[in-house]
A protein has these predicted regions:
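Bacterial N-terminal signal peptides that target proteins for export
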Residues: 1-8
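Short, hydrophobic/aromatic-rich segments at coil-to-beta transitions
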Residues: 41-46, 70-71, 114-123
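Signature of long, low-cysteine stretches enriched in small and polar/charged residues
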Residues: 101-153
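Secretory pathway targeting signatures of secreted, lumenal, and periplasmic proteins
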Residues: 48-97
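C-terminal motif of bacterial Sec signal peptides marking the signal peptidase cleavage site
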Residues: 16-20
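Surface-exposed amphipathic alpha-helical segments
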Residues: 145-168
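Bacterial signal peptide processing site
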Residues: 22-25
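Post-signal peptide N-terminal segment of mature Sec-exported envelope proteins
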Residues: 30-48
């Protein structure tokens, strides 16, 4: 009987620690919106990579997986990122944003940002349990990945840094 009580107490303590230490999806969503807006408003990162007529900033932790016409695929650990650049669209274009479709019930984040010369956006959609599609764009530039709940805000911020840096 005493062993059961000790086991139950340990399980209860472990459950409390796991729940208390995990970041909630709601917190990640709040962080995502704030980080994206800040990254959009910050000075663009200096470009450090180029392919054909596109130059861009790529964080040191990311590697180039493949390069194709208007598409680049990056990898960070097991997470893939797909960058699409439409050089026919200006930085204030809304065509790519409108192609993402209207806001749905599955969208946890669906925000837009504007300044004098640019139109930016972020969309986070749950695709399955603990897996979210993160889409960040400015004008004719769009970067997409799938992330776990705990990676949403960090991924989105990094993505906006990349997208903001793209020159074509």
């Amino acid at each position: 009987m005493k062993n059961r009580i000790v086991l139950f107490a340990c399980l209860l303590l472990l459950t409390g620690l796991l729940v208390g230490c995990s970041v909630s999806v709601d917190d990640e969503i709040k962080n995502t919106t704030a980080k994206i807006e800040e990254a959009f408003n910050n000075k663009p990162m200096e470009t450090n990579k180029s392919f054909e007529s596109i130059s861009y900033y790529l964080p040191n932790a990311m590697k180039i997986e493949s390069e194709g016409t208007n598409n680049l695929i990056f990898e960070q650990g097991k997470q893939l990122y797909i960058l699409f650049v439409n050089p026919n669209e200006e930085l204030d274009s809304k065509v790519m944003f409108e192609s993402t479709g209207a806001k749905t019930k599955k969208d946890l984040v669906f925000e837009t940002f504007e300044d004098e010369n640019r139109f930016g956006y972020v969309k986070v959609t749950e695709v399955e349990e603990n897996s979210y599609e993160v889409l960040v764009g400015i004008g004719g530039i769009k970067l997409t990945t799938q992330a776990k709940a705990s990676q949403i805000s960090e991924s989105a911020e990094q993505m906006m840094q990349i997208v903001s840096s793209v020159k074509y």
